[in-house]
Amino acid sequence: MEAVLPSRCNREDVPGKARAERFVSGFPSVCEQKTEQEKLSGVVKRVHLDLRKKYRKAGDFEKIWLEHCKDDGRLCEYAVAMKALADNHWAKKCEGEGRIEWCLGVCQEYFFNGGKKKALEKDAKRDALNKLQSSSHAEAGVSDFGVPSIKPLNDEYMTGKIRLLDVGSCYNPFLKYEDFLAVGIDIVPAVETVFKCDFLNLQIQRPLQLAPDAIDAFLKQLSSPIDYLPTELFHVIVFSLLLSYFPSPYQRWICCKKAHELLTLNGLLLIITPDSSHQNRHAVMMKSWKIAIESLGFRRMTYSKFSHMHLMAFRKTSLKTTSDLLTRNYPDMLYIPQDFNYDGEEDHFSPCCARSELEDEQLACGFTELPDTPYDSDSGESHNSTMPFYEFEDPILLLT
C-alpha cells in the first residue's frame, strides 16, 4: 500500500497523456467502473424482483423455486455477476470483506477465547435458578434441593478445525482460513471449490457415529452435487445475505430449521441480512426473527446493527428441533420489508435504469461493515454505538 499512496497523492503531476495511457493499459475510469457495476447489479436485482413477483402471482413457492433452479442460463449469469461484484467492486470500494471478518471474529471469540464456556456457564446458572423457582412450589418438607452445583464443562474449547458450512457461498471465502474446514454450497457455484446444492431440498440423514478426524475426512471427500448430509455435522453455518434471496418467509424458515438439524449442540448459526435503515427502524422485524428462530431450539447470542445490515449469531441449545406451529405462525415471522412491496413499486426497474446510491451501498457495504464490540442479547446494548438497542414489543407478534 505504501508504494501506491505516493502515486495517488501526486496524481496531478502526471501529464494528461500519461494518465490516459494508464487507463488504456488496463485501468478503467471511474465512469467505466460505475457503468459496469450498474450492469452487474441490475442482473442481481432483476432475479430477486422476478422471484418475488412470481411468488405473489402464483403463491406456490415450491413450484417457483424448482423452476428457478432449472433456469441454468439465468443462474449462471447471476453467479458470474455476484462474483464480479465481490471481486471488482465491493471489496475495492470498502477495502475489505467485513462480513467475513465479522464471522471470523465471532468464531474466534466463541470457540477459542472462552465465549462458549461463558455461554455454558450461563445456561447452568439459568437452569439452577429455574429449578429453585420450581422447587418453591413444592411441599415445605422438601427442603434439601439447594443450589445445584454446576457440572464440569467439557467441550469448552475447540481442539481441531471448525467445521463450517457457507450456504449460498458463491466463491467460498472461508476456504483460505486455516481455522476452518469450510464447505461452500450454492445452487450454481461461481468457482470449482463450491459444491452444487439446493439447500431448500437437501435431505437430512442420521448423524455420523464417527470420531472427529473421520468426520473431517468425510467432509473432504464431498463432491457435487450434494443431495444429502447427516445431522449434527457442522460447528458453524453461515447465512450471509441468503434469507432475503427467497421470496417466501416459509423458505427462510425451512433454511433455519435445516441449519438447526445440521449443527452440533452449541454450534452457531450466523445470519447477515441487508438493511440500510436507521438503528431502530426495523426493530420489530428483528424481534420477530429472534422469536421465530429461537423457537427452533436456538438462543440468540450476538446481535449488531450497522448502517447497511443486521448481523446475528444464534447458538443451538437443544438437540431436538422444536417449534409449536399450532400456537404461533413462526414461519411468517421471518418476513422482510420487500414481502409487502406492491408490484407497482418495483416495475420502475429496467436494464437501463441506474441503481440509486443507497441501493449500491446496501449491497456493497453489506459485505464490508465490521462490528466494534460484542453484543449480548441480555445486555441490551448494540455494537455500533453506546445507544441502547430497544426491541419494541409488537402485540401482534406476541399473541399466543
Swiss-Prot record:
Enzyme class: transferase
GO molecular function: methyltransferase activity; S-adenosyl-L-methionine binding
Keywords: Methyltransferase, S-adenosyl-L-methionine, Transferase
InterPro entries in the cross-refs: Bmt2/SAMTOR, SAM-dependent_MTases_sf
Binding site for S-adenosyl-L-methionine: R99, G168, D186, D198, F199, S240
One record GO biological process: cellular response to amino acid starvation
Gene3D superfamilies (alphabetical): Vaccinia Virus protein VP39
UniProt-listed Enzyme Commission number(s): 2.1.1.-
Family: Belongs to the BMT2/SAMTOR family.
Cited function: S-adenosyl-L-methionine-binding protein that acts as an inhibitor of mTORC1 signaling via interaction with the GATOR1 and KICSTOR complexes. Acts as a sensor of S-adenosyl-L-methionine to signal methionine sufficiency to mTORC1: in presence of methionine, binds S-adenosyl-L-methionine, leading to disrupt interaction with the GATOR1 and KICSTOR complexes and promote mTORC1 signaling. Upon methionine starvation, S-adenosyl-L-methionine levels are reduced, thereby promoting the association with GATOR1 and KICSTOR, leading to inhibit mTORC1 signaling.
Stored PANTHER family: S-ADENOSYLMETHIONINE SENSOR UPSTREAM OF MTORC1, S-ADENOSYLMETHIONINE SENSOR UPSTREAM OF MTORC1-RELATED
Quaternary organization: Interacts with the GATOR1 complex; interaction is disrupted when samtor binds S-adenosyl-L-methionine. Interacts with the KICSTOR complex; interaction is disrupted when samtor binds S-adenosyl-L-methionine.
The name this protein goes by in its record: S-adenosylmethionine sensor upstream of mTORC1
Taxonomic classification: Eukaryota, Metazoa, Chordata, Craniata, Vertebrata
